[in-house]
Amino acid sequence: DDLYQGIQTFYYDSPEREINTERTWLNDTIQGKEISFYKSGNIKSEGEWVNNLESGIQTFYKDSKFNEIDYTKFFENGNLIERRIALVIGNENYEQSPLNNPVNDATLIAESLKELDFDVTLVTNVATEDELEDIIYDFGEKRNRDYEVGFVYYAGHAIQIENENYLLPTKEEYDSDRDVEKNGVSIQNIMKFLEAQREDQLNFLVLDACRNNPFGNRSRSGGNSNGLAKISTPSGSLIAFSTDPGLTAPDGDGDNSLYTNSLSKNLLEPGIPIEQVFKNVYT
């Protein structure tokens, strides 16, 4: 029928003539599996495709034995599908200085992100440092492997000690700076978990924190009465605070903080670039 059928193999222009790409054709269209190789012979990717490579799944492996997935990409009609994942945390049930709104705030943001096609994990009142670190680490691993956009939102107590910022789980003790450094979770370390691993990844960290000072005068640094310290932003990331560095943010008189209420509304405004969303929130 003069239709192209069979397997097409591409080679590197090298003495070893290692396979670059192998494709399967049916009725003049590329169908089925495509396998690509590194020059060393290690398999780089394996994809399942339909309609001349316009739609399908591409899986990248770390070695030629397909033992460990590096990351995956999804395509539809020739375009990369932007997959989105979010981790939303609300901590309010503190034994020292409980808060009123973080769980409501986290729930509101989670609902807004779901409307924007994010795969959302909502956790509330995370009790310990180990638990909070595990949640963030697991999220970072999943984001790096399967998603192009990562969004982390935190509402609750946070504090700076000597220009290092810490998120505070609900059931730890914070009677001194040493307690904070031991029992809090460093935001700077969190950014290492969340840093973009590929050029096509984008990450957001939103902190509606430093609402009041849970320590009184027990901390030599003044606790979070001085707000949070400025954070260096890694490549491919955007960090947003509910207030300027060095200042505190109110918990809010209603069901939600002023910042989160504004953020939720602006996230759902159609056609607004994400940078403009946060500018609108601050105004």
What are these regions (language model features)?
Residues 106-110, 120:
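A generic structural signal for short, well-ordered alpha-helical segments in conserved domains
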Residues 93-107, 252-255:
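Glycine- and acidic-residue-enriched helix-capping/strand-helix junction motifs
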Residues 102, 123, 203-283:
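Active-site-proximal C-terminal subdomain of hydrolase catalytic domains
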Residues 120, 129-155, 159-218, 257-259, ...:
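Caspase-like (clan CD) cysteine peptidase catalytic core
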Residues 92-95, 173-175, 212, 245-248:
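A short, flexible beta-alpha/helix-coil linker loop
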Residues 83-97:
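Short glycine-rich His-centered loop
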Residues 1-81:
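Glycine/tyrosine- and acidic-biased, solvent-exposed loop/turn segments at the edges of beta-strands
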